[in-house]
Protein backbone atom coordinates (compact mmCIF):
# COMPACT_ATOMS: atom_id res chain seq x y z
CA UNK A 1 0.00 0.00 0.00
CA UNK A 2 2.98 2.34 0.10
CA UNK A 3 2.53 4.74 -2.81
CA UNK A 4 5.10 7.31 -1.72
CA UNK A 5 7.26 5.85 1.04
CA UNK A 6 10.05 3.63 -0.22
CA UNK A 7 10.07 -0.05 0.68
CA UNK A 8 13.30 0.05 2.68
CA UNK A 9 11.94 2.79 4.96
CA UNK A 10 9.23 0.37 6.10
CA UNK A 11 11.31 -2.81 6.16
CA UNK A 12 13.99 -1.34 8.42
CA UNK A 13 11.32 -0.76 11.09
CA UNK A 14 10.23 -4.40 11.19
CA UNK A 15 11.20 -6.72 14.04
CA UNK A 16 10.21 -9.98 12.33
CA UNK A 17 11.70 -11.36 9.12
CA UNK A 18 11.23 -14.26 6.67
CA UNK A 19 12.31 -17.55 8.24
CA UNK A 20 11.78 -16.38 11.83
CA UNK A 21 9.72 -18.35 14.33
CA UNK A 22 6.23 -16.89 14.67
CA UNK A 23 6.22 -14.34 17.48
CA UNK A 24 3.14 -12.26 18.24
CA UNK A 25 5.11 -9.80 20.36
CA UNK A 26 7.52 -9.05 17.52
CA UNK A 27 4.62 -8.61 15.09
CA UNK A 28 3.03 -6.09 17.46
CA UNK A 29 6.36 -4.31 17.87
CA UNK A 30 6.77 -4.13 14.09
CA UNK A 31 3.33 -2.55 13.78
CA UNK A 32 4.23 -0.04 16.48
CA UNK A 33 7.52 0.93 14.82
CA UNK A 34 5.87 1.48 11.43
CA UNK A 35 3.12 3.62 12.97
CA UNK A 36 5.68 5.70 14.89
CA UNK A 37 7.01 6.91 11.55
CA UNK A 38 3.78 8.92 11.37
CA UNK A 39 3.59 8.44 7.59
CA UNK A 40 0.65 6.02 7.63
CA UNK A 41 -2.97 6.08 8.75
CA UNK A 42 -2.82 2.31 9.28
CA UNK A 43 -0.33 -0.54 9.01
CA UNK A 44 -2.40 -3.52 10.05
CA UNK A 45 -0.54 -6.87 9.96
CA UNK A 46 -2.23 -9.68 8.06
CA UNK A 47 -1.33 -13.29 8.93
CA UNK A 48 -2.12 -15.88 6.21
CA UNK A 49 -1.50 -19.62 6.80
CA UNK A 50 0.26 -21.27 3.83
CA UNK A 51 0.85 -24.72 5.37
CA UNK A 52 0.65 -26.52 8.69
CA UNK A 53 3.85 -24.94 9.96
CA UNK A 54 4.21 -21.76 7.90
CA UNK A 55 2.42 -18.43 7.62
CA UNK A 56 2.84 -15.34 5.50
CA UNK A 57 2.77 -11.99 7.28
CA UNK A 58 2.05 -8.81 5.35
CA UNK A 59 1.67 -5.25 6.60
CA UNK A 60 -1.00 -3.38 4.68
CA UNK A 61 -0.01 0.26 5.00
CA UNK A 62 -2.20 3.22 4.14
CA UNK A 63 -0.31 6.39 3.28
CA UNK A 64 -1.46 9.69 4.76
CA UNK A 65 -0.34 13.27 4.05
CA UNK A 66 2.83 13.93 6.03
CA UNK A 67 4.12 17.26 4.74
CA UNK A 68 3.00 20.62 6.08
CA UNK A 69 3.04 24.14 4.68
CA UNK A 70 2.15 27.09 6.87
CA UNK A 71 1.76 30.84 6.72
CA UNK A 72 1.40 33.12 9.71
CA UNK A 73 0.78 36.72 10.66
CA UNK A 74 1.12 38.46 13.99
CA UNK A 75 1.44 41.79 15.71
CA UNK A 76 3.50 43.04 18.64
CA UNK A 77 4.06 46.57 19.87
CA UNK A 78 7.83 46.26 19.70
CA UNK A 79 8.06 44.80 16.18
CA UNK A 80 4.70 45.62 14.63
CA UNK A 81 3.10 43.45 11.98
CA UNK A 82 4.99 40.24 11.23
CA UNK A 83 4.47 37.53 8.67
CA UNK A 84 6.16 34.37 7.61
CA UNK A 85 5.81 30.83 6.48
CA UNK A 86 7.41 27.46 6.42
CA UNK A 87 7.56 24.07 4.84
CA UNK A 88 8.05 20.80 6.74
CA UNK A 89 8.62 17.55 4.86
CA UNK A 90 9.08 14.68 7.37
CA UNK A 91 9.15 12.11 4.54
CA UNK A 92 11.30 13.97 2.03
CA UNK A 93 11.47 12.13 -1.32
CA UNK A 94 9.80 9.14 0.34
CA UNK A 95 13.09 8.23 2.06
CA UNK A 96 12.00 8.98 5.62
CA UNK A 97 14.29 12.01 5.73
CA UNK A 98 13.17 15.30 7.25
CA UNK A 99 13.54 18.71 5.60
CA UNK A 100 12.16 21.94 7.03
CA UNK A 101 12.43 25.58 6.02
CA UNK A 102 10.95 28.56 7.84
CA UNK A 103 11.18 32.32 7.52
CA UNK A 104 9.58 35.40 9.02
CA UNK A 105 9.91 39.17 8.76
CA UNK A 106 8.07 42.27 9.85
CA UNK A 107 6.61 45.03 7.72
CA UNK A 108 8.98 47.65 9.10
CA UNK A 109 11.57 47.10 6.37
CA UNK A 110 11.12 50.18 4.22
CA UNK A 111 12.25 53.78 4.39
CA UNK A 112 10.66 56.49 6.49
CA UNK A 113 8.33 57.15 3.54
CA UNK A 114 6.91 53.62 3.69
CA UNK A 115 3.36 53.24 4.97
CA UNK A 116 4.43 50.47 7.38
CA UNK A 117 7.58 52.16 8.62
CA UNK A 118 7.79 53.22 12.25
CA UNK A 119 11.18 54.45 13.55
CA UNK A 120 10.30 53.34 17.09
CA UNK A 121 9.84 49.71 16.07
CA UNK A 122 12.51 47.12 15.40
CA UNK A 123 13.18 45.60 12.02
CA UNK A 124 13.10 41.83 12.18
CA UNK A 125 13.75 38.90 9.87
CA UNK A 126 14.75 35.28 10.38
CA UNK A 127 15.43 32.20 8.30
CA UNK A 128 16.23 28.59 9.17
CA UNK A 129 16.71 25.36 7.26
CA UNK A 130 17.32 21.88 8.65
CA UNK A 131 17.76 18.36 7.32
CA UNK A 132 17.82 15.02 9.16
CA UNK A 133 18.31 11.45 8.01
CA UNK A 134 17.13 9.23 10.91
CA UNK A 135 18.66 5.98 9.59
CA UNK A 136 21.59 6.67 7.28
CA UNK A 137 21.91 3.91 4.66
CA UNK A 138 19.39 1.86 6.68
CA UNK A 139 21.70 1.75 9.70
CA UNK A 140 20.90 2.75 13.28
CA UNK A 141 22.77 6.04 12.85
CA UNK A 142 21.15 9.45 12.57
CA UNK A 143 22.77 12.44 10.88
CA UNK A 144 21.42 15.96 10.67
CA UNK A 145 22.26 19.61 10.54
CA UNK A 146 20.75 23.06 10.33
CA UNK A 147 21.55 26.66 9.43
CA UNK A 148 19.83 29.67 10.97
CA UNK A 149 19.91 33.45 10.73
CA UNK A 150 18.17 36.23 12.62
CA UNK A 151 18.39 40.01 12.39
CA UNK A 152 16.74 42.47 14.72
CA UNK A 153 17.12 46.20 14.30
CA UNK A 154 17.18 48.63 17.16
CA UNK A 155 14.00 50.36 18.26
CA UNK A 156 13.12 52.62 21.15
CA UNK A 157 9.86 50.81 21.91
CA UNK A 158 10.30 48.47 24.91
CA UNK A 159 13.48 46.76 23.80
CA UNK A 160 17.20 47.28 23.24
CA UNK A 161 18.03 50.10 20.78
CA UNK A 162 21.02 48.27 19.29
CA UNK A 163 20.97 46.22 16.09
CA UNK A 164 22.10 42.62 16.28
CA UNK A 165 22.55 39.72 13.89
CA UNK A 166 22.73 36.08 14.96
CA UNK A 167 23.86 33.37 12.56
CA UNK A 168 24.87 29.81 13.23
CA UNK A 169 24.92 26.18 12.30
CA UNK A 170 24.82 22.81 14.02
CA UNK A 171 25.51 19.20 13.19
CA UNK A 172 23.96 16.21 14.93
CA UNK A 173 24.67 12.52 15.20
CA UNK A 174 22.43 9.95 16.84
CA UNK A 175 22.27 6.25 17.53
CA UNK A 176 19.65 3.67 18.51
CA UNK A 177 20.82 1.70 21.56
CA UNK A 178 20.60 -2.02 22.23
CA UNK A 179 20.93 -1.58 25.99
CA UNK A 180 19.02 -1.26 28.28
CA UNK A 181 16.59 -1.90 25.40
CA UNK A 182 16.07 -0.70 21.85
CA UNK A 183 13.53 1.93 22.87
CA UNK A 184 16.53 4.02 23.94
CA UNK A 185 18.43 6.34 21.65
CA UNK A 186 20.93 9.13 22.02
CA UNK A 187 21.78 12.24 20.01
CA UNK A 188 24.80 14.49 20.24
CA UNK A 189 24.87 17.98 18.76
CA UNK A 190 27.64 20.52 18.17
CA UNK A 191 26.56 24.09 17.52
CA UNK A 192 28.33 27.36 16.69
CA UNK A 193 26.66 30.77 16.71
CA UNK A 194 27.92 34.28 16.18
CA UNK A 195 26.23 37.46 17.36
CA UNK A 196 27.21 40.83 15.90
CA UNK A 197 26.07 43.94 17.78
CA UNK A 198 25.79 47.38 16.20
CA UNK A 199 25.21 50.42 18.39
CA UNK A 200 25.21 54.16 17.76
CA UNK A 201 27.67 54.82 20.58
CA UNK A 202 30.16 52.97 22.80
CA UNK A 203 27.94 53.77 25.77
CA UNK A 204 24.95 51.96 24.24
CA UNK A 205 27.15 49.04 23.27
CA UNK A 206 28.41 48.77 26.84
CA UNK A 207 24.95 49.08 28.36
CA UNK A 208 23.11 46.61 26.16
CA UNK A 209 25.81 44.20 24.97
CA UNK A 210 28.50 44.34 27.63
CA UNK A 211 30.78 46.25 25.27
CA UNK A 212 31.05 43.33 22.85
CA UNK A 213 30.75 44.09 19.15
CA UNK A 214 30.90 40.36 18.45
CA UNK A 215 30.39 37.27 20.56
CA UNK A 216 30.66 33.58 19.71
CA UNK A 217 28.76 30.72 21.26
CA UNK A 218 30.10 27.18 20.96
CA UNK A 219 28.06 24.45 22.58
CA UNK A 220 27.81 20.68 22.80
CA UNK A 221 24.66 18.88 23.89
CA UNK A 222 23.65 15.31 24.60
CA UNK A 223 20.09 13.96 24.66
CA UNK A 224 19.20 10.49 25.93
CA UNK A 225 15.61 9.44 25.48
CA UNK A 226 13.36 6.42 25.69
CA UNK A 227 10.08 6.37 23.81
CA UNK A 228 7.69 3.42 24.18
CA UNK A 229 4.46 5.19 23.18
CA UNK A 230 2.14 3.31 20.87
CA UNK A 231 1.52 6.30 18.58
CA UNK A 232 3.33 9.62 18.06
CA UNK A 233 0.21 11.82 18.08
CA UNK A 234 -2.61 10.32 20.15
CA UNK A 235 -0.77 7.98 22.49
CA UNK A 236 -2.85 5.63 24.63
CA UNK A 237 -0.14 3.69 26.47
CA UNK A 238 3.59 3.83 27.05
CA UNK A 239 5.98 6.53 28.18
CA UNK A 240 8.42 9.09 26.88
CA UNK A 241 11.54 10.06 28.81
CA UNK A 242 14.29 12.47 27.78
CA UNK A 243 17.28 14.02 29.51
CA UNK A 244 19.21 16.78 27.74
CA UNK A 245 22.47 18.32 28.91
CA UNK A 246 24.15 21.25 27.20
CA UNK A 247 27.46 22.93 27.90
CA UNK A 248 28.55 26.15 26.22
CA UNK A 249 31.89 27.90 26.41
CA UNK A 250 34.68 27.10 28.87
CA UNK A 251 36.87 24.46 27.22
CA UNK A 252 34.87 24.81 23.98
CA UNK A 253 35.71 28.49 23.61
CA UNK A 254 33.55 31.49 22.84
CA UNK A 255 32.10 34.14 25.11
CA UNK A 256 28.89 32.37 26.16
CA UNK A 257 29.51 30.22 29.24
CA UNK A 258 26.64 28.23 30.71
CA UNK A 259 25.26 24.78 31.43
CA UNK A 260 21.68 23.68 30.90
CA UNK A 261 20.02 20.42 31.96
CA UNK A 262 16.40 19.42 31.27
CA UNK A 263 14.59 16.27 32.39
CA UNK A 264 11.21 15.52 30.81
CA UNK A 265 8.92 12.62 31.76
CA UNK A 266 5.59 11.65 30.20
CA UNK A 267 3.57 8.51 30.69
CA UNK A 268 0.15 7.42 29.43
CA UNK A 269 -2.38 5.24 31.25
CA UNK A 270 -5.63 3.99 29.67
CA UNK A 271 -8.62 4.45 31.98
CA UNK A 272 -12.08 3.71 30.55
CA UNK A 273 -13.61 3.81 27.09
CA UNK A 274 -11.30 6.06 25.00
CA UNK A 275 -10.06 8.21 27.85
CA UNK A 276 -6.33 8.21 28.57
CA UNK A 277 -4.60 9.76 31.57
CA UNK A 278 -1.39 11.58 30.67
CA UNK A 279 1.04 12.54 33.45
CA UNK A 280 4.07 14.71 32.84
CA UNK A 281 6.91 16.25 34.76
CA UNK A 282 9.59 18.65 33.55
CA UNK A 283 12.59 19.80 35.56
CA UNK A 284 15.47 21.94 34.40
CA UNK A 285 18.16 24.27 35.60
CA UNK A 286 20.73 26.61 34.06
Which ranges hold each PLM region?
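N-terminal periplasmic "start-of-domain" segments of outer-membrane beta-barrel proteins
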Residues: 4-19
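Gram-negative/organellar outer-membrane beta-barrel architecture
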Residues: 6, 20-233, 239-242
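Glycine- and acidic
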Residues: 12-16, 68-69, 247
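PPIase-associated folding chaperone regions across multiple families
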Residues: 75, 253-255
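Transmembrane beta-barrel strand/turn architecture of Gram-negative outer membrane proteins
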Residues: 165-174, 241-249, 256-286
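Active-site-adjacent structural elements in folded domains
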Residues: 226-229, 247-252
Amino acid sequence: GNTRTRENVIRRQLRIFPGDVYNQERIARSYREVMMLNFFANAAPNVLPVSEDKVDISFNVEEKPAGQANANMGYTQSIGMTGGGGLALPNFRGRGQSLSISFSANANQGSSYSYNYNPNRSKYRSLSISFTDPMVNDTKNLLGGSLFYQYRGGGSMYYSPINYTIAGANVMWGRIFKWPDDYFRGTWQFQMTRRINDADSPEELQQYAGGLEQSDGISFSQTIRRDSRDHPEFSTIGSHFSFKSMISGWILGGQENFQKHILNLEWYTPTFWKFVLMNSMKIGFV
